[in-house]
């Protein structure tokens, strides 16, 4: 609730995306959203009148840090390498479940996966695939929320927003205007 207020989410319809080690999208609502599929959850806001509906993922920035360590590159180098690869990574896909999955699929046993790996894939492909994999996980969260409320624009906060490339990938994949 405090993070939501700090991000400027004060009125119904206000939404924010927090992109750090973990990530989430939270949207202020007049009343809690009851998702029969239990993909989302609600937290009462500080005003005691509204709540925010959340969708979360465990390993956003954690995935970026993990692949950076594996490849021995800094964030600037990761961004440069990823920018050299076309969207779609020539078929390389990353599922960002290093610490299980939360929304919209709650599965503590889920694990991270690189799929479609072949000999054409270089470091840049793996870097971009991580950015895209996190973006598609956030799209699943955004799409689940869109079933209950309009979601077109979010206040974007967190260390991940320092990457212009990653921010743009997230905006493109989720179809969200990031502010």
Predicted feature locations:
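Active-site core segments that coordinate phosphate-bearing ligands/cofactors
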Residues: 1-179
């Amino acid at each position: 609730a405090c993070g939501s207020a700090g991000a400027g989410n004060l009125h119904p319809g206000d939404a924010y995306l927090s992109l750090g080690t973990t990530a989430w999208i939270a949207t202020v609502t007049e009343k809690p959203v009851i998702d029969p599929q239990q993909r989302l959850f609600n937290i009462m806001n500080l005003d005691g009148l509204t709540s925010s509906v959340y969708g979360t993922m465990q390993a956003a920035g954690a995935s970026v840090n993990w692949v950076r360590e594996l490849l021995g590159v800094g964030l600037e180098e990761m961004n440069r390498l990823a920018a050299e690869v076309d969207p779609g990574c020539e078929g390389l896909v990353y599922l960002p479940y290093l610490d299980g999955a939360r929304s919209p699929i709650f599965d503590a046993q889920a694990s991270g996966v690189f799929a479609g790996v072949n000999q054409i894939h270089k470091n840049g492909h793996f870097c971009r695939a991580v950015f895209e994999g996190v973006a598609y996980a956030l799209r699943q969260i955004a799409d689940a929320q869109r079933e209950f409320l309009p979601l077109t624009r979010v206040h974007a906060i967190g260390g991940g927003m320092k990457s212009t490339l990653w921010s743009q990938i997230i905006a493109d994949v989720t179809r969200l205007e990031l502010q």
